[in-house]
Design a protein with these regions (language model features):
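Short, solvent-exposed loop/turn segments at secondary-structure junctions
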Residues: 59-61, 123-124, 141, 163-165, ...
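A structural signal for short, well-ordered beta-strand segments
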Residues: 119-121, 156-158, 227-231
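Non-heme Fe(II)-dependent double-stranded beta-helix
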Residues: 2-147
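Short hydrophobic-aromatic micro-motifs
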Residues: 53-54, 156, 205-207
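Catalytic core of non-heme Fe(II) oxygenases with the double-stranded beta-helix
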Residues: 131-198, 236-245
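A short, structural micro-pattern
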Residues: 115, 150-152, 221-223
């Protein structure tokens, strides 16, 4: 089992922060966590290129169990398939969301209080017709350009099989996040500068909300099996709604799960007055 960052409830802040941290200006606590988890090179790559890899994210036994759960919950039995709203469909999905390395990258790219936006899977078989082209986009599709300086979303994909060009890995255009806009139709068609991500099974490949990327074409036998985890800043509406999960379901979950589901901020609740204890914390998280 992958241990969460910590299970104790953190104290609510009572002091408003006046300054907003700029992207990749990490607090001492966050720097220490990055170093302890061996993520320094990963963070630097993400800062420069807009995407990155979390290697050895979990033991291969975990990856195999994750892969089995993806197949077991997929809709359909052949061809491209997958599933959405996976959080409650197998305990291993919640464990994947709470991975300490993953959550550290999420905090760096989307700040404290980031919410789980979507948890889905895809199973992509070998393509027998022409190679896939087009489909380049930025995941901040519902954010107008120019994109904010602070990243709004992050997608992290658990690669349950090797990620290779011939295996249909996600394709990205490095540094495209610096443009802070959506690609034009001409840029989507041309795909100038596109590369395929490459990493072994057991890696989490991720990109920020501004990077231009798209799916690849699998030209070899077998299937590409991936768990997609998307997070957003707490001010954004998530894609999937887990409001139906009550305190009974959350009772044995760590504090981090409450944060990811928006239970520790005052937004989308029954008014500010009823949640005064969380107002300051929410405002401070928004500045990270």
């Amino acid at each position: 089992m992958i241990k969460p960052l910590e299970k104790e409830r953190r104290p609510i802040s009572s002091t408003f922060e006046s300054e907003t941290r700029q992207p990749f200006d990490l607090s001492d606590d966050l720097k220490a966590r990055v170093d302890a988890l061996g993520l320094a090179e990963t963070v630097q790559h993400a800062k420069e290129e807009g995407y990155g890899y979390i290697y050895d994210a979990a033991p291969m036994e975990f990856i195999e169990h994750l892969k089995e759960a993806i197949y077991r919950n997929a809709e359909g039995f052949e061809g491209p398939r997958g599933s959405n709203m996976l959080l409650t469909k197998d305990p291993i999905f919640a464990e994947a969301v709470l991975n300490p390395k993953l959550l550290t990258i999420v905090e760096i790219l989307c700040g404290k209080g980031a919410m789980l936006s979507q948890l889905s899977s895809t199973i992509i078989p070998k393509r027998t017709d022409s190679p896939r082209k087009g489909g380049l986009h930025a995941d901040q599709n519902w954010t107008p350009a120019p994109f904010p300086v602070h990243n709004q979303t992050i997608t992290l994909c658990w690669a349950c099989v090797d990620y290779t060009p011939e295996g249909g890995s996600t394709r990205v255009i490095p540094n495209s996040h610096l443009l802070r806009r959506h690609p034009t139709s001409e840029e989507v068609a041309e795909e100038a500068g596109v590369i395929s991500t490459e990493c072994p099974a057991g890696t989490i490949v991720f990109w920020n909300g501004s990077i231009w990327h798209g799916g690849g074409t699998r030209t070899i036998e077998g299937e590409r099996v991936v768990l997609h985890t998307t997070f957003s800043r707490m001010a954004m509406r998530p894609i999937e709604n887990y409001d139906f999960l009550g305190e009974e379901w959350l009772a044995d979950k760590p504090y981090e799960m409450r944060v990811l589901l928006g239970r520790e901020d005052f937004l989308n609740k029954d008014g500010t007055r009823a949640n005064l204890d969380k107002v300051t914390q929410t405002m401070n998280w928004a500045k990270t």
